[in-house]
Swiss-Prot record:
The gene is CTF4. One of its GO terms (cellular component) is nuclear chromosome. It comes from Saccharomyces cerevisiae (strain ATCC 204508 / S288c). GO terms for biological process: DNA repair; DNA replication initiation; DNA-templated DNA replication; double-strand break repair via break-induced replication; establishment of sister chromatid cohesion; mitotic cell cycle; mitotic sister chromatid cohesion; nucleosome assembly. PANTHER family: WD REPEAT AND HMG-BOX DNA BINDING PROTEIN, WD REPEAT AND HMG-BOX DNA-BINDING PROTEIN 1. The modification Phosphoserine is found at S377, S379, S398, S463. The lineage of its organism: Eukaryota, Fungi, Dikarya, Ascomycota, Saccharomycotina. Accessory factor for DNA replication. It plays a role in accurately duplicating the genome in vivo. This is DNA polymerase alpha-binding protein. Keywords: DNA replication, Nucleus, Phosphoprotein, Repeat, WD repeat. WD repeats lie at residues 10-49, 134-173, 227-266, 273-313, 699-739. One of its GO terms (molecular function) is identical protein binding. The modification Phosphothreonine is found at T401, T411. The keyword Cytoplasm does not apply. Present with 3280 molecules/cell in log phase SD medium.
């Protein structure tokens, strides 16, 4: 039964705001007179803690059980530690701040106000690094969708701007106009002269607030109290992240879908009552079935928004400031806490009981009804967590035949109580091995015994090296290029490349997927609800392919709305699973753990099926497919083929791949990256085709390998064209760093597009840093030699009396490569790049229209590097070495330059021999 409890918190009254901590027990109650009290809602008799806080509070956000943020009309952004009662000034601004929220799992905070910019502060950073985003109008209120990583900014001109926060720099993706109230804050109360004038003119301007109630409780003497300072424009987000609500200017609540930002339905209060603008609006945090709103008449209305029915309504005598939902200890009963302008709070107890949310989403409902493939990814930790002797790394190995006796994955109920067809329901009680913990990061809960707590996520580990001796029990895991594990978060990247990245967020019932792009001018980010637990993904410029490794379902979703998406079920044998998928605008490819290689056209029509060695990774470009295999007999191998319109051509078929599996030894027992190798036992971070169509692979050794001359089987070879560990070492000034990592995206000519990851994990987390570029460098340098050369340079500077402070700064700068060593590397790099480009031109012709100019520039760089080496040999009077280098020069003008260098070095015999080379080449050209 619903009951209302009034609790006086501040005897002196005043504007009082409430915010509830994630534990649903710690309630922060802030008063504008400079006090904040911490109440324990589960122990109402307990004496509350009292903190001295800032006056003129404008918003409060309790984002953890021990910290909350506060903004003030004086422009202060503050953070408070509940445990230590410590206040921390994060930033100060000239104009008032109006609202705040916390993003990226508490790593950053967003503040908005009258300064015409959004301020992002890094909370984890001691200096609280600030990022400012210019906006067109003053901020009214802000809110954050943690599931989809979206920030909604309401402005005083009535516009709502939606920003994607999936990358470091927020990206505006949509704008809603003419829905919310265009409302400017009334700050005349802050000016004493203006405030007195307004009091003398008319004390009854706020006739919107009149109501028949006790005058002692109804009248608020605070000059800040007026309709303009109470109206809510904040976007309310559904806990699943796929819907949001707006408090609209027509005094209705409008529900929108994040898919296309389309209006789903409109909720209104009782038509017989006096309508008024809303002062707060919130979805219930449990399942999002209910939405609560309070209007300027202090009338609380709670809707079941899915049925559009009013669940509860009540009009309060006290003036309400804001509201906060509370989940009771039984995890199903909901209370509502309301702040007031009189120093008290009201608690509406037993307001509602959570029911299973059945959010209407046509595309999801249709797909679910057709295929009934919802996958609950909570199955594989029962053995891991229930047995202390089992190691995390053991999850890499499992006899695949154990999966052969799996029971049916679900039961289907077609008819509901009403006799109408309903969405299928699934029973997972007996299906503990339905889906594996595919990232090995411990995010799947084991089957919970009745009346017992869930298992702890902390388990013992012991070493288990990966070698050919263990391949009999090797577990094939789903792989997507540059995919990341969940780790200990609720989100991960399914895949990423030069086009963009696909992320998924898991909640209690399903996953939510976001497809984001680096080129925001060309593509538009989109979201959808994933009921099937997709764990495979491939992104291209036209669309995205998703796959579920255990059920065999694949789905292709074009980026535009012109072409329709399609879904297909891949037949799987007992114990077989899809291990990798790839898609181009013309072909879709699926590989499995038993070696089935299936190809389809862009509309899902089967093109071919083939049996190979077990496939562990795939990528594709146009009609070409690069696949990696792994078997206990042959280790790692690769295939390169072209799927023509009428036939398939193999360039390479299951040839040895010069890579080894990562060795998980005792040293990695406590390694923070053990989760990654559980998730990806191959250690392949990504594989892709270069911009000129050459296969590339980036493994656990952080070296980029490129397949050269692959069109000629006798000449093909793997070339190490970049050792990223060496490049990081050079950029760090010769220091061995363990907190900077390279995450590959693509190879564009001679530049690796990548994400520079900072931190203990080798994979990128949220938000995604901006892509960086790293020029390829052939691995020819020796660290000890480079350090010796740089030390010698510093010693020379000391001899000539260089500034000591400047010298200390030099030590932190990038390692300088001596001229002779740099020339050797440039010579080799130019040679490799020119060979690759020549091979492309001879077989595929020009792809971008400037290949011949690029090739000429490469030949010039090649000869210049050789001439530097030639000059060094001449200065050392090493005629034989100089002559060998002269033979490698390509252009006649380079030979002419070599002659001049030889003359300057007074080596007449070398001059004569080089002239003979020139004459021989000239005669050969005449033939």
């Amino acid at each position: 039964m619903v009951s209302v409890i009034d609790k006086l918190v501040f005897d002196f009254g005043g504007k009082t705001l409430v915010s509830l901590a994630p534990d649903n027990n710690t309630l922060c109650v802030a008063n504008k007179n400079g006090l904040t009290k911490i109440l324990k809602t589960n122990n109402p008799e307990e004496e509350p803690e009292t903190l001295d806080s800032s006056k003129l509070v404008s918003s409060i956000k309790c984002y953890s059980n021990s910290h909350f943020l506060m903004t003030t009309m004086q422009g202060d952004a503050l953070r408070y530690n509940i445990d230590s009662s410590q206040e921390e000034l994060l930033a100060r601004f000239a104009l008032p701040l109006r609202d705040c929220c916390v993003i990226h799992s508490g790593k950053m905070a967003v503040f908005g106000g009258d300064d015409l910019e959004l301020i992002l502060l890094e909370l984890d950073d001691e200096t609280h690094k600030k990022h400012a985003i210019k906006i067109d109008e003053q901020v009214s209120q802000i809110s954050y969708n943690s599931q989809m990583n979206i920030l909604a900014v309401s402005m005083i001109n009535g516009k709502v701007q939606i920003f994607s926060l999936t990358s470091t720099i927020p990206n505006k993706v949509h704008e809603l106009n003419d829905y919310i109230v265009a409302n400017s804050y009334d700050d005349t109360h802050r000016d004493k002269i203006l405030s007195n004038m307004m009091d003398d003119i008319d004390k009854d301007n706020d006739n919107d607030l009149s109501e028949t109630a006790d005058p002692d409780e109804n009248n608020v003497a605070d000059p800040e109290f007026c309709a303009a300072n109470r109206i809510c424009t904040r976007v309310a987000w559904h806990p699943k992240g796929l819907h949001f609500a707006l408090p609209c200017a027509d005094d209705t609540v409008k529900i929108f879908s994040i898919k296309g930002y389309s209006l789903q339905k409109t909720l209104s209060t009782n038509l017989s009552s006096t309508k008024a603008h809303f002062i707060d609006l919130q979805f219930d945090p449990l399942r999002g079935t209910y939405i609560a709103a309070v209007d300027l008449n202090n009338k609380l209305t709670v809707w079941n928004w899915e049925t559009s029915e009013i669940h509860y309504t009540r009009e309060f005598k006290r003036k309400i400031t804001n509201i906060a939902w509370k989940i009771q200890a039984d995890s199903k009963t909901l209370d509502l806490v309301l702040g007031t302008w009189s120093g008290s709070i009201a608690i509406v107890q037993n307001l509602a009981e959570s029911v299973v949310s059945n959010i209407p989403d046509q595309s999801v409902a249709e797909s679910s009804t057709k295929h009934g493939l919802f996958v609950d990814s909570e199955s594989d930790l029962e053995n891991l967590e229930g047995n202390d002797d089992i190691n995390k790394s053991d999850k890499l190995f499992s006899d695949i035949t154990q999966e052969a006796n799996a029971e049916d994955v679900f039961t289907q109920t077609h008819d509901g109580p009403s006799g109408l067809s309903e969405k299928r329901k699934y029973n997972f009680e007996d299906e503990e091995d339905f889906i594996d913990d595919d990232d090995g990061a411990g995010y799947i809960s084991g089957k919970k015994p009745h009346n017992e707590h869930s298992y702890s996520r902390v388990h013992k580990t012991h070493s288990f090296p990966i070698s050919l001796a263990n391949t009999g029990k090797f577990r094939y895991m789903p792989f997507s290029p540059a995919g990341t594990p969940f780790g200990f978060t609720d989100r991960r990247y399914l895949t990423m490349n030069e086009v963009g990245y696909v992320s998924t967020v898991k909640n209690s019932e399903q996953y939510s997927i976001t497809v984001s792009f680096f080129d925001v001018g060309r593509f538009r980010e989109y979201h959808f609800e994933d009921l099937f637990g997709y764990d495979l993904c491939f992104l291209n410029e036209k669309g995205t392919l998703f796959g579920q490794s255990k059920t065999g379902q694949i789905q292709y979703r074009p980026h535009d709305s012109i072409h329709s998406n399609w879904t297909k079920i891949i037949p799987l044998q007992a114990g077989e699973r899809i291990t990798s998928v790839a898609a181009t605008p013309v072909r879709v490819i699926v590989g499995t753990s038993l070696g089935y290689f299936r190809s389809f056209n862009q509309f899902g029509v089967p093109f071919a099926v083939e049996k190979t060695s077990p496939i562990v990774a795939l990528t594709a470009q146009n009609y070409r497919v690069f696949s990696v295999h792994y078997s206990q007999f042959h280790g790692l191998s690769y295939s390169l083929s072209e799927l023509g319109t009428s036939s398939k051509r193999y360039y390479k078929r299951e040839c040895p791949l010069p890579m080894s599996l990562p060795n998980i030894n005792s040293d990695m027992k406590k390694d923070a990256n053990l989760d990654y190798y559980n998730f990806n036992p191959m250690g392949i971070k990504s594989l892709f085709f270069s911009s000129y169509g050459d296969p590339c692979i980036f493994g656990s050794d952080n070296t980029l390998l490129l397949l050269s001359k692959w069109r000629s089987p006798e000449e093909s070879k793997w070339l190490p064209i970049l050792d990223s560990n060496m490049e990081i070492w050079k950029m760090s000034g010769g220091k061995e760093t363990t907190d900077i990592h390279v995450w590959p995206l693509a190879l564009a000519y001679d530049t690796l597009n990548c994400i520079l990851v900072k931190g203990k994990h080798i994979w990128p987390e949220f938000p995604l840093p901006l892509p960086s570029e790293m020029e390829i460098r052939m691995p020819v340098f020796v660290k000890s030699k480079l350090l010796e050369e740089n030390k010698a340079i510093l010693n020379k500077k000391n001899e000539i009396g260089a500034d000591t402070e400047a010298e200390e700064g030099e030590e932190d700068k990038e390692i300088q490569i001596p001229v002779s060593m740099a020339a050797e590397e440039e010579y080799l790099r130019s040679k490799v790049l020119s060979e690759l480009l020549t091979d492309t031109l001879e077989n595929d012709g020009e792809m971008y229209g400037n290949e011949n100019e690029v090739l000429a520039a490469l030949n010039g760089a090649y000869d210049k590097a050789l001439l530097r080496l030639f000059a060094s040999a001449c200065s050392d009077q090493n005629v034989e070495k100089a002559l060998s280098l002269a033979h490698e020069l390509k252009q006649d003008r380079a030979l002419t330059a070599a002659v001049k260098i030889s003359e300057r070095a007074e080596l007449p015999s070398l001059v004569k021999k080089i002239n003979n080379i020139r004459e021989a080449r000239y005669e050969q050209q005449l033939k």
